[in-house]
């Protein structure tokens, strides 16, 4: 009987997870740099899961983030870039992987006008990012990505037309990639430059009522307040009974 109940619980959870990273989300008025999605929820979704994800690094703030994650024994997923600002910190990618965290693709340039000019331009950007990562990690093992601005961003329409994201999502899956957005946004990389307390409030607001949380954070040079907030963010989710995992581990529950 216990096995039957457990199997039923996992079936419900996996259905929710599948909807979270493979569904067409309604666009919101949220700025594209902090694009949110509506999480699928279920009354019987157990266990409660949270994925901490960090975009746009590595940077000087990546190391203290890794130290906090190590101290708290919490895994995370890093959607990395290879911009000029990242160049001196690229060796940290090896440290991220060595610590047991997940490396995933974000963008080589993070310049919307370039990466969304066409589908070919997007995949050239991904190729450049993979090449930048080759000295530090097994790029063949990386099969997750996050679209800059999210999978339903509208800024891409200016450069590649209204249908470009739909095409890119289909192409990503054809190429063997998983892609994922988020449903909890720290807003730590916005122009308002929130302090640590506000970052935590933003997360608590978005996480409320969700049993599966994918949290958007950043590990750029400008997000020192994220480092300050991280211990309290982790404490909050622990107090709420969440289990921490990478996005790949979440998908593996299927």
What would you call each of these model-derived segments?
Residues 1-51, 67-76, 135, 183, ...:
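Terminal accessory/targeting
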Residues 2-3, 99, 175:
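Short secondary-structure boundary micro-motifs
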Residues 22-142, 252-253:
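Active-site beta->alpha N-cap acidic-glycine motif
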Residues 110-216, 220-238, 242-243, 249-253:
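Catalytic domains of cell-wall/extracellular-matrix polysaccharide-remodeling enzymes
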């Amino acid at each position: 009987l216990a096995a039957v109940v457990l199997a039923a619980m996992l079936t419900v959870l996996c259905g929710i997870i599948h909807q979270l990273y493979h569904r067409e989300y309604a666009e919101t008025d949220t700025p594209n740099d902090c694009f949110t999605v509506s999480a699928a929820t279920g009354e019987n979704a157990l266990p409660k899961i949270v994925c901490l994800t960090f975009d746009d690094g590595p940077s000087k703030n990546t190391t203290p983030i890794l130290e906090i994650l190590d101290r708290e024994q919490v895994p995370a997923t890093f959607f990395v870039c290879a911009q000029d600002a990242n160049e001196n910190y690229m060796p940290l990618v090896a440290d991220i992987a060595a610590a047991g965290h997940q490396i995933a693709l974000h963008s080589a340039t993070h310049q919307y006008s370039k990466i969304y000019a066409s589908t070919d331009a997007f995949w050239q950007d991904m190729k450049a990012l993979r090449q930048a990562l080759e000295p530090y990690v097994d790029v063949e093992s990386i099969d997750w990505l996050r679209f800059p601005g999210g999978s339903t961003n509208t800024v891409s329409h200016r450069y590649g037309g209204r249908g470009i994201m739909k095409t890119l999502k289909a192409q990503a899956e054809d190429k063997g990639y998983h892609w994922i957005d988020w449903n909890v946004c720290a807003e730590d990389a916005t122009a308002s430059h929130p302090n640590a307390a506000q970052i935590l409030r933003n997360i608590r607001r978005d996480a409320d009522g969700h049993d599966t949380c994918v949290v958007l954070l950043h590990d750029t040079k400008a997000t020192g307040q994220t480092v300050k907030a991280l211990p309290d963010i982790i404490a909050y989710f622990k107090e709420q009974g969440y289990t921490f995992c990478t996005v790949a581990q979440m998908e593996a529950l299927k």
